[in-house]
Swiss-Prot record:
May act as a substrate receptor of a CUL4-RING E3 ubiquitin-protein ligase (CRL4) complex involved in the negative regulation of cellular responses to ultraviolet-B (UV-B) illumination, likely in coordination with RUP1. Interacts with COP1 and probably prevents the formation of active UVR8-COP1 complex, thus avoiding UVR8-COP1-mediated positive regulation of UV-B responses. The gene is DHU1. Disruption phenotype: Hypersensitivity to ultraviolet-B (UV-B) illumination leading to short hypocotyls under UV-B; the sensitivity to UV-B is alleviated by the disruption of UVR8 and requires the presence of COP1 and HY5. The double mutants dhu1-1 cop1-6 and dhu1-1 hy5-215 phenotypes resemble that of single mutants cop1-6 and hy5-215, respectively. The UV-B responsiveness of the double mutant dhu1-1 rup1-1 is similar to that of the single mutants dhu1-1 and rup1-1. InterPro entries: DHU1 (IPR046377), DHU1_N (IPR048514), LRR_dom_sf (IPR032675), U2A'_phosphoprotein32A_C (IPR003603), WD40/YVTN_repeat-like_dom_sf (IPR015943), WD40_repeat_dom_sf (IPR036322), WD40_rpt (IPR001680). The lineage of its organism: Eukaryota, Viridiplantae, Streptophyta, Embryophyta, Tracheophyta. Keywords: Nucleus, Repeat, WD repeat. WD repeats lie at residues 145-198, 212-256, 439-480, 485-525, 538-577, 581-621, 625-664, 666-710. One of its GO terms (biological process) is response to UV-B. This is Protein DWD HYPERSENSITIVE TO UV-B 1. GO terms for cellular component: Cul4-RING E3 ubiquitin ligase complex; nucleus. It is found in: Nucleus. The keyword Repeat applies. The keyword DNA-binding does not apply.
Length: 783
């Protein structure tokens, strides 16, 4: 057996290397040797602390050579720290870290390295047991390298939005994971990624801090400056995120001791002398801190609630004679999702502690019940099957009496059960310039509609007033109609159903035209538009919405007014203006899909109204009210329901016959008066899709039960990753579980995109696999 190099010999070697390179030894490295010698003399584990942020370029070569010697020395472990700005660039720091990889124990890296560094680390892996990373400039986490010894992973205070398809796939021993104060918000992709961790026991996206409200000095005491410092030690001044506290409050069992309920696991560590990383890696600091704070509260030395934490993020529960107040701190956005805690407990059966609250059997029972009542595991209540099994059953016709529609639903469920992240891709024509006389011109969509009969076509209108018919399967432009000269944004589009080559386009300046796309140009051009093949109607000032009836005889227009105009398509004339139909302007007007006389209007006056052209226009059939202004309304494909979307995620389904509430989808609001929500149907009447302009999430819910099937997070490119939001969306009328989303960016320099979403395919699907199951509806389907 080879003799291990002693620490004193290593130190001498380092000094000699420095002399060879003509530099003075680094004092931080000499201190590390001294500390290691002290530990050795006390018969403690010989651990060296290496502070890379104190290493300068002159120190680099001697240290790199020394690290190669450490692997064969009596040093038992290396704890590597970068706590402040590091002078070493990525391509210097990475070889240094890898040179001691065999003995790495703890790696703590903070705000120092770029994307290339992290991509290399996460792809190649490390042999450390603890990895603590902060201020990392990566939005999509994709740790696929071998981290076979990793026990604790701390990712707090990073701008992580989501996870790659194979993230966490090589971490067999990971037991503790913390992702507080990140941007993670998606329950579905997060749970799918975390399921790849077979040993995960403790997880946190937030910290529940307990303090007592039983102090006699609740309202009268004024804390000293030292007390304020103590508070800030445990609760940072960041504004808290509204957490799913009611789930937590309901599951707190007052019969249990406090210690069994509040598991004070803190991942901010202080490495112990013994190698007990397999029990708890340095949790003493946080545990003692919370106990100390609780004792101060009970003795009246602290106010019962810190001033920088909103009471919305607290709940109180009695334990005997003591009332404990729990405060959410450092919460990631995922914590504000409704039933977040119950969803995670149900999805991660091996988890023992979530957000430092212990999970008991009663919690799991409640989680199963909550999940069943509020979520769909697979569409159409199907059980998980393989695609091969479903296809075999269809070929054998083993299930008597089953229709083709039943097999199709089973196949959809089987396909949706496979990918964690659905296939998303932007229509390709937006990724490059359209060659025009003006070389800087690009088509920027503002509204779009699927063709009623041709599954490959959609029309979109641009910010500059152009109308473009696109083959969205090939990405090629089929027809192009330039702006009529005013360059006013197209806000209203509607295909005719009986005459499917005709499309109505309405502009923000009030212009209304009917185009025959067969007579339009097949190439993009800036030449003046020929009026042949188009019909011009009387203008409707500040137009926002147009829609034709089921017989293609009439269409309606609404805008920033209280009025609605009725037009005769065949004659090209305006028949009537219905005045003062609402108290505020009318956002959307929609005809019924089957009746040529019924139509609905939605307004910011909080009302949705149903009208009948055969009756007096001053009196609606009924009025249904929301608590906020209505952004839009649409009929279900069979006209049984009205889907009303109000500001900030208030989505309700009404019975068309009398306006009674059928379902409230109970989507969590963002508490924003500018969060305009839009919702449409998908898969006929089966599901609804909903998105809002302040969020990058599309929610998919069952239209019959209101249960959430899943959320889809939009992903921008590069720095825009988390800056996309939903401007409009439509379910694909020909493909089950497919949709398109008009997604805009917060930055004015970035153009909008039309993003196609396929819930049945994963993001690494081939082109052949990405096509959805087609279900050709009747031509009467509108909206």
């Amino acid at each position: 057996m080879a003799t291990l190099t002693e620490i004193a010999t290593l130190e001498e070697k380092y000094i000699e290397l420095c002399k060879m390179h003509g530099i003075l030894p680094n004092t931080a490295i000499l201190s590390a040797f001294f500390e290691a010698e002290v530990k050795k003399s006390r018969n403690q584990r010989c651990i060296m602390n290496l502070y890379v942020d104190r290493v300068k370029y002159d120190d680099y070569l001697p240290l790199l050579e020394l690290c190669n010697e450490i692997n064969t020395s009596e040093v038992q472990g290396i704890d590597l720290f970068v706590r402040s700005a590091c002078s070493l660039e990525d391509h210097y720091a990475l070889p240094l870290i890898r040179s001691v990889n065999q003995k790495l124990r703890v790696v703590h890296l903070h705000d120092s390295f770029g994307k290339n560094f992290w991509q290399d680390v996460f792809f190649q892996g490390l042999s450390c047991k603890v990895l603590n990373v902060r201020s990392m400039h990566i939005h999509k986490l994709n740790i696929v390298g071998e981290f076979t010894q990793l026990h604790t992973l701390i990712l707090d205070k990073n701008r992580i939005v989501g996870f790659g398809e194979d993230c966490f796939s090589c971490m067999p021993k990971l037991t503790y994971l913390s992702m507080c104060d990140t941007l993670v918000s998606d329950l579905w992709t997060s749970a799918a990624a975390l399921l790849k961790l077979p040993s995960l026991k403790e997880l946190r996206f937030q910290i529940w801090i307990s303090c007592s409200d039983s102090s006699p000095l609740n309202s009268e005491s004024s804390p000293s400056s030292s007390t304020k410092d103590d508070i800030n030690t445990f609760i940072e001044s960041d504004p808290p995120v509204e957490a799913d506290m009611w789930d937590v409050a309901e599951q707190m069992d007052p019969s249990l001791p406090v210690e069994e309920t509040l598991h004070s696991m803190d991942f901010s560590y202080k490495i112990p002398e013994q190698d007990d990383l397999d029990s708890h890696v340095s949790v003493s600091a946080g545990l003692n801190g919370e106990v100390l704070m609780r004792e101060k509260v009970r003795r009246g030395k602290m106010p019962y609630q810190p001033k920088d934490v909103s009471p919305v993020d607290t709940f109180t529960r009695q334990f005997g004679n003591v009332g404990l107040k729990y405060i959410s701190s450092k919460a990631s956005p995922i914590c504000s999702e409704k039933h977040y805690r119950m969803y995670m407990i149900n999805s991660l059966p091996k988890l023992q502690v979530l957000d430092n609250l212990a999970i008991r059997k009663s919690d799991r029972d409640k989680a199963i019940e909550t999940y069943s009542a509020n979520f769909e595991d697979l569409p159409y209540k199907r059980k998980k099957e393989s695609v091969v099994r479903v296809l075999e059953n269809r070929e054998k016709r083993s299930s008597k009496g089953k229709s083709q529609n039943s097999y199709k639903r089973s196949l959809c469920a089987a396909k949706m059960g496979s990918p964690a992240s659905p296939l998303l891709h932007s229509l390709p024509f937006l990724s490059s310039r359209i060659q025009q006389e003006d070389d800087n011109s690009r088509l920027c969509p503002r509204q779009f509609e699927y063709h009623p009969l041709d599954p490959s076509l959609m029309v979109f209108g641009t910010l500059d007033g152009e109308v473009v018919v696109l083959n969205h399967e090939s990405g090629k432009i089929f027809r192009y109609i330039p702006s009529n000269g005013s360059q006013s944004t197209i806000l209203g589009l509607c295909w005719l159903k009986i005459y499917p080559s005709m499309v109505i386009a309405g502009s923000a300046n009030g212009s209304l035209k009917l185009y025959d796309i067969q007579k339009a140009s097949s190439t993009v051009t800036t030449s003046s538009h020929s009026t042949s093949g188009s019909v011009t109607f009387d203008e409707f000032d500040q137009l926002t919405s147009v829609h034709a009836n089921s017989t293609d005889q009439l269409f309606l227009a609404s805008g920033y007014s209280k009025d609605v105009a009725l037009y005769d398509i065949g004659r090209g004339t305006r028949l009537q203006v219905f005045a003062n139909m609402h108290q505020e302007h009318i956002n959307v007007v929609k005809f019924s899909n089957h009746s040529p006389f019924l139509f609905a209007t939605s307004s910011f006056d909080k009302d949705v109204k149903l009208w009948d052209l055969r009756q007096e226009p001053s009196r609606p059939c009924y009025t249904a009210s929301s608590t906020k202004g209505n952004v839009m309304v649409c009929f279900s494909p069979d006209d049984r329901y009205l889907l009303a979307s109000a500001v900030d995620n208030e989505v309700r389904q009404l019975l068309t016959v009398d306006g009674r509430l059928h379902l409230n989808f109970e989507i969590v609001p963002r508490v924003s008066s500018m969060n305009y929500t839009r919702s449409y149907y998908m898969n006929g009447n089966d599901y609804i899709i909903s998105g809002s302009c302040d969020e990058n999430v599309i929610r998919v819910c069952c239209a019959q039960t209101g249960r959430r099937l899943r959320d889809v997070t939009l992903e921008g490119n590069g720095s825009d990753f988390s800056m996309m939001y939903v401007q409009s969306l439509r379910g694909d009328p020909f493909r089950d579980f497919n949709m398109s989303v008009l997604a805009a960016y917060a930055r004015s320099s970035s153009l909008s995109e039309i993003v196609k979403v396929n819930l049945l395919a994963s993001r690494d699907s081939t082109a052949e696999e990405s096509h959805g199951l087609r279900s050709y509806p009747s031509s009467s389907m509108g909206g």
